[in-house]
Amino acid sequence: RGLGAGANPEVGKTSAEDHKSEIEDALEGSDMVFVTAGEGGGTGTGAAPVVASIAKKMGALTVGVVTRPFKFEGARRTRQAMAGIEELREVCDTLIVIPNDRLMQLGGEELSIVEAFRAADEVLHNGVQGITNLITIPGMINVDFADVRSVMSDAGSALMGIGSARGDNRAMTAAEQAINSPLLESTMEGAKGVLLSIAGGSDLGLHEVNAAASMVEERADEDVNLIFGTIIDDTLGDEIRITIIATGFDAEANMTQAAAQQQPQQEQRCLLYTSP
């Protein structure tokens, strides 16, 4: 009937299970499925694991990209989100969790609530687009689906960092932004798998690609499977955009390390399934 789940995950779960055949029909023939959701409510929390489970059983590389609620959304919503995230982690090849509270560090004190939720949506979009563009858009250095699968299949938790820069040292600046993105609750130190997307205009230099890739490689495991591709997009002008997806790291140890680092400051086909 087009109604929501009333912030009840069981309602969202039951609704998805009752429409299993329709979901299977929608996913038929997909090599890769992205399940995106805002965790904490009914539909995203309850339905997303059902969709992901179906996709994985059908043989698709299944990637979850979800947001965790803002603190102001309440303790109950946060508890539901954490439970939903753990359930989703069990049925996805790779799960990327974006903490909405971190978005406030990107917008400053003047960030409106409309802008905050729009930013959360944009981060989800950018995460998916950063991966799919590697596969679907030709570049100087191309990446195919097998490359992406080698990094993301049964990888568990993943980190996503995004950076952009113009002018002098733009590649290094963008890479540094992506590596130290406020969206990261953990560091990518010791990552055993990394997808690196570098987008720029036709003036994108090989030395810039090398500099960015080398910086990322230094932070990862010495035997990292680093898959990187370049995308030529002249609409970017002199801007370079870098997206990093890192997998295969010790999340608990890296979160402790990230907290310690912040303490001194006090502070081929892809199908996208979206749950509100």
Model-derived features: positions:
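Tubulin/FtsZ superfamily GTPase core signature
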Residues: R1-P276
